[in-house]
Amino acid sequence: KDGISEEYYENGQLKLREVWANQVKDGLEEIYYVTGQLQHRVTWQGGYKNGTEEKFYANGQPELTGTWALKTKNGPWAEFRENGQLVLTGVYRGGQKQGRWKEYYPNSQLKNNSMFDKDKKQGLFLAYYRNGKLSMKGNYTADKRSGKWEFHRESGAFDRVEIFDDN
């Protein structure tokens, strides 16, 4: 295949538009719902995703936004619920989670706040109940709980401390 390729639904609406060069995807790819609403958009380079990727729900709300660097997730990444609320946000470097990642409950309250280094939890971790009260607080070292961890009840009251030692 070379050039622009298009597919259509039976109702005549555009279903898929993609660009090919030398038998591989190379350029903008767009996929549409039968209603004509954009479902998915991503740029390809030499057969690999490269650049921004966006997915949308049928109602037009974003489902996912992310960045690729030649087939590898690289850059800001966010996932959303159908009502537009954020589910997850963070950054990929070289295909691995790096830095701060946050996950949210359906009520938009922060669920957890994690630090990552090369796809492994590293450093301070905070988890919360749906009501926003702190559930647990501790540190990770190379994806394992380490040191002192504090646990709290849903009321926010302190519950206990546990010590994690990798020995």
Tell me the role of every PLM-derived stretch.
Residues K1-N167:
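Glycine/tyrosine- and acidic-biased, solvent-exposed loop/turn segments at the edges of beta-strands
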